[in-house]
From Swiss-Prot:
This is 8-amino-7-oxononanoate synthase. It comes from the Bacteria. Pfam families: Aminotran_1_2. One of its GO terms (biological process) is biotin biosynthetic process. It catalyses: 6-carboxyhexanoyl-[ACP] + L-alanine + H(+) = (8S)-8-amino-7-oxononanoate + holo-[ACP] + CO2. The modification N6-(pyridoxal phosphate)lysine is found at residue 236. InterPro entries: Aminotrans_II_pyridoxalP_BS (IPR001917), Aminotransferase_I/II_large (IPR004839), AON_synthase_class-II (IPR050087), PyrdxlP-dep_Trfase (IPR015424), PyrdxlP-dep_Trfase_major (IPR015421), PyrdxlP-dep_Trfase_small (IPR015422). Pathway: Cofactor biosynthesis; biotin biosynthesis. Its EC number is 2.3.1.47. Pyridoxal 5'-phosphate binds at residues 109-110, 182, 207-210, 233-236. Keywords: Acyltransferase, Biotin biosynthesis, Pyridoxal phosphate, Transferase. SUPFAM superfamilies: PLP-dependent transferases. Homodimer.
Length: 382
């Protein structure tokens, strides 16, 4: 009989043979976007701290002050004793930024998606998900126990065909997509999605984890569009931690009563809430700051003759896991931290470097990086 340890060892060995094994590397945060790997100070090209607000003096001070005043932890779930007054201030700011009636904050983006989708969708409903949407969206869809169909990435013709065929057979239909796709950096075709959802009486939900704070002067990828369910995170451009849903007041009230990942988990620490509030205030006060990550990414794509960046995320597709690991190691020799992204995070044959640019990524380093990346592009083209 195979023991648990034998089972684990065999599975790990199989991953290692395919160069898909993961290990944790201790990475100290310096002043964003700089990190420490051991004694080496490296420029991070893999961090989602797009506005560098996680190390901003104002957010740090807000977290320190709130922790000193209110303590380290929430002490309970939000529906019992963990609903600190700072939550109200945070949710008011989120709703204002996103242009909705209300907002609700979760413990993380993953918790938000696995709570929101099952709270809205029943087994006799239908979920249509972009095939490249984040893993937590697919996890949330699975928990709803409804029929789920993945449509080809950003293919509105295919989505329209599915809606035409499937809509009459289901009580409700939920279309879910990333606003900014986390591994490719491209944007969802928001206007077309809104039009299709209206035409077929479907609900549209977008995950704006990588759009809030950096697109449309910080409002995110859904700004100016009628998107009733705007989900996102506070852990990237906002620089803190947590997830949220911005929606109408009735929808938020329903989620508060039905989302298990909201009900049965402890509230966020007061220091985290205070830091997020301060970060949102900084975003609202400085539209120019929100534009800088995309401007940095566009500089890089111009220098490398890549397609114009649509977000702060620029993928360098290399194909094999071995090629991605080799490219990552090469950049590390030049003090650039660019993690290799391999299956199952991305489809087989599309291993890559996922480069991210922040407001404080130096232009001089972007120019140097472009010189290092160009030979990789020539190799893949050939």
């Amino acid at each position: 009989m195979q023991t648990l340890d034998d089972f684990a060892a065999r599975r790990l060995s199989a991953l290692e043979k395919r160069q898909l094994s993961r290990v944790l590397h201790e990475t100290g945060r310096d002043s964003s976007p700089w990190v420490m790997r051991g004694e080496r100070r490296m420029l991070s090209l893999s961090c989602n701290d797009y506005l560098n607000l996680s190390t901003h003096p104002a957010t740090i001070r807000a977290a320190i002050d709130a922790t000193a005043q209110f303590g380290v932890g929430a002490g309970g779930s939000r529906l019992v004793t963990g609903n600190h007054p700072l939550y109200t201030a945070l949710e008011v700011r989120l709703a204002a930024l996103k242009g909705t009636e209300a907002a609700i904050v979760f413990g993380s983006g993953f918790l938000a998606n696995i709570g929101i989708i099952p709270a809205l969708i029943a087994p006799n409903d239908l979920i249509l998900v972009d095939e490249l949407a984040h893993a937590c969206i697919h996890a949330g869809a699975a928990l709803a126990h409804a029929r789920t169909i993945r449509f080809p990435h950003n293919d509105m013709q295919a989505l329209a065909g599915l809606l035409e065929q499937e809509r009459p057979q289901h009580d409700h239909v939920l279309i879910v997509t990333d606003g900014v796709f986390s591994m490719d950096g491209d944007l969802a075709p928001m206007s077309a999605l809104v039009e299709l959802s209206a035409r077929y009486n479907a609900w549209l939900m977008t995950d704006d984890a990588h759009g809030i704070g950096v697109l449309n002067e910080g409002h995110g990828s859904a700004y100016g569009h009628d998107v009733p369910l705007q989900m996102g995170t506070l852990s990237k451009a906002v620089g803190a931690y947590g997830g949220y849903l911005c929606a109408s007041a009735p929808v938020v009230a329903l989620i508060r009563n039905r989302a298990r990942s909201f009900i049965y988990t402890t509230g966020l620490p007061p220091g985290t809430l205070a830091a997020a509030i301060t970060a949102l205030d900084l975003i609202a006060a400085d539209p120019a700051l929100t534009m800088q990550p995309l401007e940095k990414a566009k500089l890089f794509t111009r220098l490398t003759s890549l397609p114009d960046a649509q977000s702060p995320i620029v993928p360098i597709l290399l194909g094999s896991a071995e090629a991605a690991l080799s490219a990552s190691a090469m950049l590390a020799e030049h003090d650039y931290l660019a993690a290799a992204i391999r299956p199952p995070t991305v489809p087989a044959g599309t291993a890559r470097l996922r480069l991210t640019f922040t407001a404080l990524t130096p232009d001089s380093d972007i120019m140097r990086l472009a010189e290092l990346i160009r030979p990789l592009l020539s190799d893949t083209a050939g």
